[in-house]
Amino acid sequence: RDLVRSRGLGDVYKRQMRPYAQKLGLDVPLVSYNGALVKGALSGKVYVNSPLKLQTALDLLQYVKENGHYVQVYMGDKLYVKEENEYSRMYAKISGIQAVAIGEEIYSIKEAPNKLLLMTATENFEATWKDVEEKFKGRVDVTSSKDNYLELMEPGVNKWQAVKSLAENFGIKPEEIMCIGDSNNDLSMIKNAGIGVAVANAKPQVQKYAKMVTASNDNDGVALAIENILTAQINVPE
């Protein structure tokens, strides 16, 4: 009944998520920014909006500037970067989303962003994650969707909280929910949903908490999991 993504509602909403809802004729809620924003696919109705506090975002951006990190700022339906570089080009190639380069203005934004995405070299990833958590303890929640992506959200914001909020809105119990994922930012859903499903190419820690593992995403794992549940072809362990 809903679509959950870590990316934003700008180009992703128009190119990757909304077309499926339109094709099916369903005004389903679209969960984006790791749960920070939930909007109706067709109506645009806002169910959840939990951006980072502006001062927290500005402090994070100053940290990014001082440490020479690459950052992406998700604000409204736009994605902003300081300048185009290998990271922005890589992200555009993977996601199909073209960022808007705004130079030094990125460090002095005037609007609270939905999410910040910090990219590092893989070998610096763990150390950077730890440093951000220590310096901004209690002010930001950190997760990741790839080995060099640090995703920074308002405390308490995650995919499960967004799904849970929607479920309560529709009168659905947690045990009646199935969530499918592959990365660290999916763990909150996998752990708490009645049926947490990991695709075969999911991170080991995601598979560890999943109640079932389906085929990889390249082998229609999501479709197979849904079909199996709907046709009661599997027994979900307690």
What are these regions (language model features)?
Residues 40-58:
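Glycine/small-residue-rich loop that forms an oxyanion/phosphate-binding "nest" at active or ligand-binding sites
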Residues 23-27, 47-50, 87-92, 159-161, ...:
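Short, hinge-like loop/turn segments at secondary-structure boundaries
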Residues 29-31:
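Short, small/acidic-rich helices and loops at N termini and domain boundaries
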Residues 9, 27, 113-114, 193, ...:
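Short, well-ordered alpha-helix to beta-strand connector turns
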Residues 2-13:
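Single conserved hydrophobic/aromatic residue that forms the stacking wall/gate
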Residues 59, 63, 67-189:
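Conserved acidic, metal-coordinating active-site core of Asp-based
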Residues 151-238:
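Mg2+-dependent phosphoryl-transfer enzymes with acidic/Ser/Thr/Gly-rich catalytic loops
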Residues 15-24:
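Metal-dependent catalytic neighborhoods of phosphoester/phosphodiester hydrolases
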